Amino acid sequence: MLKTTKKSLLVFMGGFFLIFGVDQAIKYAILEGFRYESLMVDIVLVFNKGVAFSLLSFLEGGLKYLQILLILGLFIFLIRQIELFKTHAIEFGMVFGAGVSNVLDRFVHGGVVDYVYYHYGFDFAIFNFADVMIDVGVGVLLLRQFFFKQKQNKIKA
């Protein structure tokens, strides 16, 4: 039991630091002036003061503290739900690494460093690698939970 918990913690930390590091490296390149333009996607620098689609931007500086509370609350929840943590350590590592990276941006740059602008056929919100990793992590977690439960139900039947 302890061995699987240690392994899960290592997997979590590996995912956390990988996503955090890659995201911060990309943001560094953007902050140093990297730009790209095409018919579909542009790489531009935007400081997002809100969350997705600039929601909650009216909270200004308080948003980063709200996000810290959310991250800490989720982490405390996971400590108490150790089986959930062990089952989805990589997904939680991705989500936490990306979330902490975005919160760090708020403290260092005054807003999240966003840069991917999709505009082919319609304008989409500008986002970053961390945003994608949060979506992927949550998506994989939900898919695994759904299919795992389906598999468990078939075994019981």
Curated annotation (Swiss-Prot):
It is a multi-pass membrane protein. The chain crosses the membrane at residues 10-30, 38-58, 59-79, 84-104, 122-142. Its EC number is 3.4.23.36. One of its GO terms (biological process) is proteolysis. Keywords: Aspartyl protease, Cell inner membrane, Cell membrane, Hydrolase, Membrane, Protease, Transmembrane, Transmembrane helix. It is found in: Cell inner membrane. It is an enzyme of class 3 (hydrolase). One of its GO terms (cellular component) is plasma membrane. It comes from the Bacteria. It catalyses: Release of signal peptides from bacterial membrane prolipoproteins. Hydrolyzes -Xaa-Yaa-Zaa-|-(S,diacylglyceryl)Cys-, in which Xaa is hydrophobic (preferably Leu), and Yaa (Ala or Ser) and Zaa (Gly or Ala) have small, neutral side chains. One of its GO terms (molecular function) is aspartic-type endopeptidase activity. Pathway: Protein modification; lipoprotein biosynthesis (signal peptide cleavage). It holds the Pfam family Peptidase_A8. The active site is at D114, D131. PANTHER family: LIPOPROTEIN SIGNAL PEPTIDASE. Belongs to the peptidase A8 family. This is Lipoprotein signal peptidase. It comes from Helicobacter pylori (strain HPAG1).
